[in-house]
Every structure is written in structure tokens, then in C-alpha cells.
Amino acid sequence: MKIEYADAEGRWLPTSVALMMDAVKRCQVRVAYRDGTVVCVNGNEKERLKSGGIDLPPCGYWAKSGDGQIVVASDDVGGVRADYCESPKYIFLRARGSEAVRAKARTEGTALCRVTDDGWEIISLGNRPCAFRIPGGTATALDFEGKELGQAEATVKDGWYSVKPFPGAFSYRVKR
């Protein structure tokens, strides 16, 4: 494991050097694990963390598993603060304020797309518009208990699969 701290110029310093130079007070840290997992945290409440391709807002974070299958971030890509997670089992995005677009999700609110045995389940809190980069298929609107409400209108545009909000729907079952 390697722990480093960023200095004011964005250079990553080993902990021993960062302690001597007071860089640890900036609260901008990167941890690299033996399996290739990397975690970057900007604990600074006022300054951005910009170093080696990482650009995080105050109190932001970014991490990627060693195999590249899991990515999590709290960032402000395109000027929109959002929390994002992408994994083999689900994609999650919570936008803060306006529409957020990340690698495999797009929404103005909070949305989740989880893998099921025969496709996916899309949950959009407040039944707000959202889109995911999934192959798609037929969509069925479900209420909170999982009861079918009817077929929902779904579209694929520019690689984004979206379901038109269906009145009373809690989630959407998307079959391959």
C-alpha cells in the first residue's frame, strides 16, 4: 500500500515528506493498494484537488478497483456535483441541482439501474427522467410492492436507454 498527499502544486508526496512539508494539512490524499485499487480523497473544504488527471472539488472523492470493474466518485464533471457508482451489479447516480451525465448514467435526480436475472431494474426516486447505457428491451412499470402497472414507453437514443415516467411507478423492469 502506498499513501501520498498532494502539495499546493498538485505533486504527490510520500507521507514522510508530506509531514515535513505540512502538505498533510491540505487533506488531499491518494491511497494505492497492491491489487491496483486507487482511492483519492479531497478532504479540503475550500480548494480543488488537481493532480495527475484527478480533478476533485472540495470534499470530493474518486476510487477505482484494481480490476477496473468498480468506479465511485463524488465530483462535479461539467460543473454539476454528483455522486456516481458503476459496478458489475448496478449503476447509481445522484445529481445535485441539475442534470448530471456520467459514463453510464444521466439524471436530474437520483437513479439506480441494477442487474436482474433477466435484464435490469431501473429505479428513479420521484419517478424523474433518467437514462442508462444498457442495451435495453421492453419496460414494465412497477409499483412499490412490485405489482405491474403496465408497459412503459422506452427509447434508445445515442446509446442512452430511457423510460418515459409512468404514473404511479416506483421502478421499471427491463427485459433483455
Where are the predicted features?
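C-terminal beta-strand-rich structural cap/linker in extracellular carbohydrate-active enzymes
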Residues: 55-114, 118, 156-176
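Short acidic, gly/pro-rich beta-turn/loop elements at beta-sheet edges
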Residues: 50, 132, 149, 173
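Solvent-exposed beta-hairpin/edge-strand motifs
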Residues: 54-68, 134-149
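Carbohydrate-binding surface patches
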Residues: 11-49, 82-138, 143
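Short, surface-exposed loop motifs enriched in S/T, G, D/E and P with embedded aromatic residues
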Residues: 151-155
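Aromatic/acidic polysaccharide-binding cleft in carbohydrate-active enzymes
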Residues: 1
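Ordered core of a single globular domain
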Residues: 4-11
